[in-house]
Amino acid sequence: MVSVLHPMHLVCQSRFLLPAYDGAEVELAGFVWYQGWNDGVNPKTAVPEYEQNLVHLIHDIRKEFGAPKLPVIVGELTGPWVEAPKEWTALRKAQAAVANRPEFKDNVVFVPTHDFVRKAEDSPNPGHGHHEFGNAETYFLVGDALGKAAVQMAGRDRQVREIRGWTLRVDER
């Protein structure tokens, strides 16, 4: 069974999960969203509402954490259906459209992952397409792209930063 931990739980439990940071202030610096398969298999109801639901999710997370400009990285749905039926294409377009909304300018980014999926015959589990055939290269490429986007987003609007008692001011001239 796979369970998803609520982000607030992770923040509250950070001293147990990351003991080296016990006592340090914890800041949620961003949120990565890489999901859509379950919506894609429900094309009649979930796909048409995906964009608006993702917008609501972003607003809800920002409200929950009191972070109105929290950076959000939306990873494109991957899978063996890269050249998929129109419903999957519509879902991917909805993911990209969220990042293009004026209300999310400069704090939500869409990360294309379309080209990272490796063929079934080049993968260890060719019958398990909804997890990219278990291909580690696909996982690495997706994770690397999402991570790079997160690092780039974290650097925006961070002119003053406190790190363990030090205050850093960044001059980006």
Regions found by a protein language model. Name each.
Residues 1-173:
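Cell-envelope and extracellular/periplasmic
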